[in-house]
């Protein structure tokens, strides 16, 4: 069954979701978009992307819609999701990608408007479930879960990294650090901002930032609840990020080779195939841009000092995450 999708918020993630659905040839029909920007701008930003390049499709617009390769996508400009006619359009799932309606009570407005399900493209509050594909997507229950979260891009990278290590060797405690590409909530030039770190020029500075990825790990891996904490630094690149996970393990005598072998196996067989990638090349952030894996394990960065271990994984924080949104939407749609 083709799943009918409405996108609320046609920014970086909303547009990349559409691109990813096209590239995957997913069994998805995007029937409507809601965004406060005019259609000319929305069409232009979909067609031309500074990171992803030009979309390999014909894109046009009129007063009511954007057309992609002959398929018209209805466009609305509503501030309140309660005013969106999802039911009239036959929308099955809303991708909530504004970043504003992350609480279940707010996202429920899409359900009230006729949508069957909502997937929030960010950590959610009081949602029915939080999912990382390949890690806990088997826990999705169509009967009881209607407003769910795709977690964060960093949690999507961290969860496979932590799961493989914990399953093979055990984690007593851990600390995650992510060097994360800058995002639109930072200033291009120094200027006022509610967060004084993010007030500084994004393209000129390494900027300390908050992250809830480590604390959120317990939502998808309950066995690690309370065992991880973390920090984040925004770095002056537009996309391409890395997670370093430092672990205290109860297992003695581990070697780099033993640890790497566990990740190589997990990437080649089992639930993480297609989500976890094993890499032995000497890569940098540019090399993983437009890689659709959630977590790209870098074997060359593994370090061991007794029971203290560091493992690392790269992720394209936009493209990889948007592909997981498509995967989760297909999973939810298949169970409708």
Labelled PLM ranges:
Residues 230, 242, 246-336:
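C-terminal active-site/capping subdomain that shapes the small-molecule cofactor and substrate pocket
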Residues 8, 12, 40, 89, ...:
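Conserved active-site and cofactor/substrate-binding residues in soluble primary-metabolism enzymes
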Residues 144-145, 201-203, 240-244, 308-310:
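Short, solvent-exposed beta-strand edge segments and adjacent coil->beta transition regions
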Residues 66, 131-133, 147, 189, ...:
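Short clusters of hydrophobic/aromatic residues that line enzyme substrate/ligand-binding pockets
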Residues 22-26, 163-171, 181-184, 211, ...:
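Generic secondary-structure signature for well-ordered alpha-helical cores
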Residues 3, 26, 172, 231-233, ...:
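Structural beta-strand/beta-sheet cores of well-ordered domains, especially the beta-sheet scaffolds
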Residues 1-199, 303, 327, 335:
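N-terminal Rossmann-like NAD(P) cofactor-binding subdomain of oxidoreductases
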Residues 170-232, 238:
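Catalytic core of tubulin tyrosine ligase-like
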